[in-house]
């Protein structure tokens, strides 16, 4: 069983660094394509300020020169979902569960264990980077599929732009999750609820060592409970009354 989570734009580098590992060929090809951009070209590529683009330029060049600082991915990313994941004071069993079951999907690194070393970078599958004439999705599809081809159960906490990197055969094995709030009988869903709930849900998976869909259905976390009436066999819905 594998659990897939996305990367995040927000990062925290106020952490002890760890040793880097060599980039996969697919990752090196992406980095080589990114490294062709000047700082001013990155400004329009990323749609960010000149200051932010200069920072990203330095990050890319540091990776290219192999001088970049690396951090455990789970702690480097610091978006809303990540801030709601239990990342510290893990028991040995929780640490093992993380290492064996939780994987990050990255447009630079591929599908990698959640504690893998990563350097600060900005890249997702909505960005129009061409790698040897291919889109990022086409470039990564075979490697993404290879990582999961032996898995029978895949829990996806990804957004659709990450899920569609995988082939239909792999996507057919994915169990997806929706998190909603019930406000006086009105069911609401928005990105803040979803991101916080994904983090809390992953924490519940880790703490309860969940291995099956049946075990996931029984979870109560952060006020959310499973709603069978709203769910499909491979699309679980959890609702929180507010």
From Swiss-Prot:
Organism, as annotated: Streptococcus pneumoniae (strain Hungary19A-6)
Source species, domain of life: Bacteria
Protein name as it appears in the record: UPF0246 protein SPH_1662
Similarity comment text for this entry: Belongs to the UPF0246 family.
InterPro entries reported in the protein's UniProt record: YaaA (IPR005583)
One Pfam short name: H2O2_YaaD
BP GO annotations: response to hydroperoxide
Transmembrane region(s): none
One GO CC term on file: cytosol
């Amino acid at each position: 069983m594998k659990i897939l989570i996305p990367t995040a734009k927000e990062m925290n580098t106020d952490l002890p660094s760890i040793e880097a590992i060599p980039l996969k060929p697919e990752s090196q090809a992406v980095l080589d394509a990114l490294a062709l951009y000047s700082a001013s070209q990155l400004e329009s590529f990323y749609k960010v300020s000149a200051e932010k683009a200069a920072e990203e330029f330095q990050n890319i060049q540091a990776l290219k020169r192999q001088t970049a600082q690396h951090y455990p991915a789970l702690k480097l990313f610091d978006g809303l979902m990540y801030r709601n994941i239990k990342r510290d004071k893990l028991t040995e069993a929780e640490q093992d569960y993380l290492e064996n079951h939780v994987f990050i999907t990255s447009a630079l690194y591929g599908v990698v264990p959640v504690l893998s070393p990563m350097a600060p970078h900005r890249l997702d599958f909505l960005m129009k980077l061409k790698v040897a004439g291919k889109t990022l999705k086409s470039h990564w599809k075979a490697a993404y599929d290879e990582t999961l081809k032996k898995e029978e159960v895949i829990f996806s906490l990804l957004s659709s732009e990450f899920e569609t990197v995988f082939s239909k055969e792999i996507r057919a094995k994915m169990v997806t999750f929706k998190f909603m709030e019930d406000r006086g009988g009105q069911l609401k869903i928005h990105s803040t609820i979803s991101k916080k709930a994904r983090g809390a849900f992953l924490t519940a998976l880790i703490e309860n060592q969940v291995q099956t869909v049946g075990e996931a259905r029984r979870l109560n976390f952060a006020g959310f409970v499973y709603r069978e009436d709203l769910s499909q066999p491979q699309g679980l819905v959890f609702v929180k009354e507010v």
